[in-house]
Amino acid sequence: MQIRQSVKLKKPLIHYITNPISINDCANMILAAGAKPIMAEHPLEVSEITSVSKSLGVNLGNITDNKMKSMLISGKTAYENKIPQVIDLVGVGCSKLRLDYARKFISECHPNVIKGNMSEIKAIYGIKSSAKGIDVGACDIITEQNFDENIKMIKRLSMETGSVVAATGVVDIISNGTHTYIISNGCEVLSMITGTGCMLTGIIASYISSGNILEGTALAIVLMGICGELSQHVKGTGSFRNELIDNIFSISDDIIIKKIRINSY
């Protein structure tokens, strides 16, 4: 919990290049986590913005030519200045453009965290996936039958890229190739509103700003899962969205410790 309290105390500046579908919610989620968001995406200013930020998040949702330029510029700036960064592989399972770009970004910018659902993680690894648009395909969902196989793939991807790999879903798997965490928090409603994955990436970017990459990523995923559970009592998805942001802002460490479901593998 030290990471969480440090972010709230220091209020680090987080540069997050994301999509217009979720940008407002992402900025508010970063604020709720205790950090300060800046969502600059113009190619002529992003290097300057990234260089004064404490971490960088890039999100491949609703990709455009300008954002492709900007994310690569920011990613290289972050790498050169040892600024932690996370890439969210939105849609790489259904778009060759995004898949090719993500591979280029990973190769040239060396992000500290690679995040995606299992369809996206399989695609970036080079295995055929069954992505349903930007959502995970039914055949790619983690089950008891494919659990060990998926763990091995995630660990190999982490070791090959040098990045922490975060595969999110009904069960979340986070690995740096040596240490692996399995997280079982969360609820179905998180998948029923747009942008929760993008919001999570904003929290990951906030928490890895401390430099503690594996634990910061795991804590962000735990926090989103628990707050989803706490928010699902509301009458609908609109209320859920607001309740989710409120819970990220107000949840106590004691509740997190009580409700956390995490195991090492």
UniProtKB/Swiss-Prot annotation:
<comment type="function">
    <text>Catalyzes the phosphorylation of the hydroxyl group of 4-methyl-5-beta-hydroxyethylthiazole (THZ).</text>
</comment>
<keyword id="KW-0479">Metal-binding</keyword>
<feature type="binding site">
    <location>
        <position position="168"/>
    </location>
    <ligand>
        <name>ATP</name>
    </ligand>
</feature>
<keyword id="KW-0547">Nucleotide-binding</keyword>
<feature type="binding site">
    <location>
        <position position="195"/>
    </location>
    <ligand>
        <name>substrate</name>
    </ligand>
</feature>
<dbReference type="GO" id="GO:0005524">
    <property type="term" value="F:ATP binding"/>
</dbReference>
<dbReference type="GO" id="GO:0009228">
    <property type="term" value="P:thiamine biosynthetic process"/>
</dbReference>
<dbReference type="GO" id="GO:0009229">
    <property type="term" value="P:thiamine diphosphate biosynthetic process"/>
</dbReference>
<keyword id="KW-0418">Kinase</keyword>
<keyword id="KW-0460">Magnesium</keyword>
<comment type="pathway">
    <text>Cofactor biosynthesis; thiamine diphosphate biosynthesis; 4-methyl-5-(2-phosphoethyl)-thiazole from 5-(2-hydroxyethyl)-4-methylthiazole: step 1/1.</text>
</comment>
<keyword id="KW-0067">ATP-binding</keyword>
<comment type="similarity">
    <text>Belongs to the Thz kinase family.</text>
</comment>
<feature type="binding site">
    <location>
        <position position="115"/>
    </location>
    <ligand>
        <name>ATP</name>
    </ligand>
</feature>
<dbReference type="GO" id="GO:0004417">
    <property type="term" value="F:hydroxyethylthiazole kinase activity"/>
</dbReference>
<dbReference type="GO" id="GO:0000287">
    <property type="term" value="F:magnesium ion binding"/>
</dbReference>
<feature type="binding site">
    <location>
        <position position="39"/>
    </location>
    <ligand>
        <name>substrate</name>
    </ligand>
</feature>
<protein>
    <recommendedName>
        <fullName>Hydroxyethylthiazole kinase 2</fullName>
        <ecNumber>2.7.1.50</ecNumber>
    </recommendedName>
</protein>
<dbReference type="InterPro" id="IPR000417">
    <property type="entry name" value="Hyethyz_kinase"/>
</dbReference>
<keyword id="KW-0808">Transferase</keyword>
<keyword id="KW-0784">Thiamine biosynthesis</keyword>
<dbReference type="Pfam" id="PF02110">
    <property type="entry name" value="HK"/>
</dbReference>
<dbReference type="InterPro" id="IPR029056">
    <property type="entry name" value="Ribokinase-like"/>
</dbReference>
